[in-house]
């Protein structure tokens, strides 16, 4: 089993547990160049989204693949989710380690007002 398959298996296991809770989830995906975040409701509809690909986010950054970029995305996703009336979420790290950019995004979202 390779690294990606292991990560996807962890992600599926976590998503099943979140699905049983029936709450909104903050999903994070990262690539070496970008980081993406979405708030998805229990009916699997995207409520809010933010990423380093977006022009509004990218203009504020020097680089899109670092911790500062993840913090910016965390702040944007929290603002957009709260704007739509979502304040409480479950954090879905998609099988990635809670470390570095993933942790930075989560901390920034918490500071901006999301609860998880």
UniProtKB/Swiss-Prot annotation:
The residues the entry assigns to the signal sequence are none
Give coiled-coil spans as residue ranges. none
Report the superkingdom from the record: Bacteria
Q: One Pfam family name from the record? A: Ribosomal_L18p
InterPro entries linked to this entry: Ribosomal_uL18_bac-type (IPR004389), Ribosomal_uL18_bac/euk (IPR005484)
Output one GO BP term.
translation
Q: Which HAMAP family match?
A: Ribosomal_uL18_B
NCBIfam families per UniProt? L18_bact (TIGR00060)
Subunit and partners: Part of the 50S ribosomal subunit; part of the 5S rRNA/L5/L18/L25 subcomplex. Contacts the 5S and 23S rRNAs.
Tell me what this protein is called. Large ribosomal subunit protein uL18
């Amino acid at each position: 089993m390779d690294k990606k398959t292991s990560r996807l298996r962890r992600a599926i296991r976590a998503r099943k547990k979140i699905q049983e809770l029936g709450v909104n989830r903050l999903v994070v995906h990262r690539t070496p160049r970008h980081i993406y975040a979405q708030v998805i409701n229990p009916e699997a509809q995207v409520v809010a989204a933010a990423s380093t690909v977006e022009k509004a986010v990218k203009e504020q950054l020097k680089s899109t693949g670092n911790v500062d970029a993840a913090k910016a995305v965390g702040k944007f996703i929290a603002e957009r989710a709260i704007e739509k009336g979502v304040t409480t979420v479950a954090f879905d790290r998609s099988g990635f380690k809670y470390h570095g950019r993933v942790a930075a995004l989560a901390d920034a979202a918490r500071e901006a007002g999301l609860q998880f």
